[in-house]
Amino acid sequence: MASISSFGCFPQSTALAGTSSTTRCRTTVAARLADQSDDFAPLRSSGGNCGCVNNSGEFDRRKLLVSSVGLLIGALSYDSKDGDFASASQFADMPALKGKDYGKTKMKYPDYTETQSGLQYKDLRVGTGPIAKKGDKVVVDWDGYTIGYYGRIFEARNKTKGGSFEGDDKEFFKFTLGSNEVIPAFEEAVSGMALGGIRRIIVPPELGYPDNDYNKSGPRPMTFSGQRALDFVLRNQGLIDKTLLFDVELLKIVPN
């Protein structure tokens, strides 16, 4: 639910399969933006304040979080190597791209580390505690976004990132490293993290949910709306890039 204003206008993409294909592509994008205009309308209070402030004058943390993620998604679409915005075709699996690396992101972000598997990660905060390793049971807090589809959020915790963790892990996600309980990207990202760290990962489809089904491997969205948003992206064949973005905070390690 990131604000579309953070993306700015979609740049014109180069021709994919002739002029007519390019025109259809642009028309489709424009139609989608029109359909989504209500969802992405700027939030304003009756007094003209920013939508991150409620009627009582207090900051609305959820709106502030979503706005910051919107800025991130906009930044991710910027290719700093040649100074141009990435074309829309790099984020969407257009029909003209079938058979040409289907479903894989074309973007490599210079401030992220890319592993041999294709996972890209960036430590937002380096932990100072012990390192998680295979066999350990870990407790994490996580956010998830469909960066291939308007940067929509499908999971967000209502807890302040970086706050103290007092041992009550009932509402947090927990799994055992090496048990194949989670998608490969989650397993790889958490392995080697230090306790207290926060890691942002960009997940290509091949490291995501098997068979495009979030019920087969964790983490699973906890809300119906989150499940719908993720399911729509995973099951929509031929139109949407399935690249995902996760923020993972390592809260607790129970050694094997």
Curated annotation (Swiss-Prot):
GO CC terms for this protein? chloroplast; chloroplast thylakoid lumen; chloroplast thylakoid membrane; thylakoid; thylakoid lumen
- One of its Pfam families is FKBP_C
PROSITE patterns cross-referenced by the UniProt entry:
FKBP_PPIASE (PS50059)
Q: What does this protein do?
A: PPIases accelerate the folding of proteins. It catalyzes the cis-trans isomerization of proline imidic peptide bonds in oligopeptides.
Keywords, sorted A to Z: Chloroplast, Isomerase, Phosphoprotein, Plastid, Rotamase, Thylakoid, Transit peptide
Record PTM Phosphoserine, positions in chain: 164
Q: State its Enzyme Commission number(s).
A: 5.2.1.8
Q: Which organism's genome codes for this protein?
A: Arabidopsis thaliana
Q: Give the PPIase FKBP-type domain ranges.
A: 135-254
Q: Which reaction does it catalyse?
A: [protein]-peptidylproline (omega=180) = [protein]-peptidylproline (omega=0)
Say yes or no: keyword Protease present.
Answer: no
Q: Where in the cell is it found?
A: Plastid, Chloroplast thylakoid lumen
Question: What Gene Ontology molecular function terms does this protein carry?
Answer: peptidyl-prolyl cis-trans isomerase activity
- InterPro entries referenced in this protein's UniProt entry, alphabetically: FKBP19-like (IPR044208), PPIase_dom_sf (IPR046357), PPIase_FKBP_dom (IPR001179)
Family note:
Belongs to the FKBP-type PPIase family.
Family matches, as SUPFAM superfamilies = FKBP-like
Which branch of life, at top level?
Answer: Eukaryota
Q: What is its main location?
A: plastid
Q: What is this protein called?
A: Peptidyl-prolyl cis-trans isomerase FKBP19, chloroplastic
Q: Where is the transit peptide?
A: 1-29, 30-88
